[in-house]
């Protein structure tokens, strides 16, 4: 298989400026806060991002909401504060104080962390997931300028970096759900690897909720029935077109989704699938495509988009890294009717991959805002985009 070499869009100056801006308040070391800084206006931020090349359905518009180096997972408080995890060592908060749909201030909440990809908000506290540890910042919205010292909630997750980024979210049961990816492309690891775990907010009650999951970096609960849905990335090195990434549904604990024995519900693994029957595992609800790298996903509960998008599922495709012809680099949407039937995903935001190999962005996560707009994080460009709709 040929590894494709991508052409980097010229944006070094923009990203360097963002790094200087965000790095100007480094404080006195790791895990310290810094005073807020004014963010440039939206028209300035969007300059150089080739947003004219991003294709959306009629009536939708995309703009740059904020520049955040290595931006990954997103979460939002009920009051609208946006929290951003990264693949670097920092965690940020963004506020829109005048409610004009543009980021007004950016706060650096913590630094010196080990890939703090995951962020989740509950009862005034921000939970942060690094490779092996869950931290908590209490009463964070009243302390953005001077963040508190992190409290260790749970520190017994594996330290493996392969598939070590952790997306986290609180479920309807009040537990914090935390994935543990397989520490490999394909292997037969023991617990807790290749699973989705959950713990109570205080770090007690560790439990493996589901198994047979290679690497999920996005999940959400369906607003219609409250059931858990998640993406899972298929294994590599079986060719360009198999196996597919998966969209899975886990309505109850104890389900096994097949890894490493069976992929996409119907392909036995050539090494570990011998003697296994794919019918013994839970198949995906949807096959999302091979190597598209399906990451963040959210059900849309807002009212800012047309009615047909109510309860629709948005999925960020980070894009392939080793496919002969690149795929992904987009956001797709699967509409859902009132009975809970989910349609096949179709393109929603495309254009970060052009001319076969010209990459100008890599979507990671999607997050609806209280005003009904949709945020998209991009760790390749160090940006967060905002999608709005108007007739």
Task: For each feature predicted by the language model, list its residue ranges.
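Bacterial N-terminal signal peptides that target proteins for export
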Residues: 2-13
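Beta-propeller domains with acidic blade repeats across secreted/periplasmic ectodomains
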Residues: 26-391
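Residue-level signal for mature regions of secreted extracellular proteins and peptides
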Residues: 12, 18-19
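C-terminal motif of bacterial Sec signal peptides marking the signal peptidase cleavage site
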Residues: 21-24
């Amino acid at each position: 298989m040929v590894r494709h070499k991508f052409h980097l869009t010229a944006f070094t100056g923009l990203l360097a400026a963002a790094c200087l801006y965000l790095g100007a308040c480094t404080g006195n070391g790791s895990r310290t806060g810094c005073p807020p800084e004014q963010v440039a206006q939206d028209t300035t931020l969007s300059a150089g991002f080739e947003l004219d090349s991003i294709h959306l359905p009629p009536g939708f518009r995309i703009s740059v909401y904020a520049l955040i180096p290595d931006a990954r997972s997103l979460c939002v408080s009920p009051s609208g504060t946006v929290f951003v995890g990264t693949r670097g060592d920092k965690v940020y908060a963004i506020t829109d104080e005048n409610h004009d749909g543009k980021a007004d201030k950016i706060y650096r909440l913590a630094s010196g962390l080990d890939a703090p990809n995951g962020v989740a908000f509950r009862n005034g506290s921000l939970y942060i997931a690094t490779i092996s540890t869950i931290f908590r910042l209490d009463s964070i919205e009243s302390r953005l300028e001077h963040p508190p010292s992190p409290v260790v909630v749970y520190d017994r997750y594996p330290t493996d970096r392969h598939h070590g980024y952790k997306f986290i979210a609180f479920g309807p049961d009040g537990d914090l759900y935390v994935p543990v990816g397989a520490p490999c492309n394909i292997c037969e690891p023991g617990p807790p690897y290749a699973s989705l775990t959950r713990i109570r907010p205080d770090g007690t009650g560790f439990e493996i909720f589901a198994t047979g999951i290679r690497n999920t970096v996005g999940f959400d609960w369906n607003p219609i029935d409250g059931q858990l849905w998640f993406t899972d990335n298929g294994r590599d090195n079986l060719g360009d077109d198999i196996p597919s990434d998966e969209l899975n549904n886990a309505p109850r604990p104890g389900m096994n989704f097949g890894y490493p024995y069976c992929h996409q519900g119907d392909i036995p693994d050539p090494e570990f699938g011998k003697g296994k029957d794919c019918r013994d595992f839970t198949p995906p609800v949807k096959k999302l495509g091979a190597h598209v790298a399906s990451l963040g996903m959210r059900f849309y509960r807002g009212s800012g988009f047309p009615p047909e998008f109510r309860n629709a599922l948005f999925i960020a495709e980070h894009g392939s890294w080793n496919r002969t012809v690149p795929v992904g680099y987009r956001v797709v949407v699967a509409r859902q009717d009132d009975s809970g039937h989910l349609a096949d995903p179709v393109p929603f935001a495309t254009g970060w991959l052009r001319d076969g190999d010209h990459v100008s962005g890599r979507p990671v996560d999607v997050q609806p805002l209280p005003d009904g707009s949709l945020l998209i994080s991009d760790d390749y460009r160090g940006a967060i985009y905002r999608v709005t709709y108007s007739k």
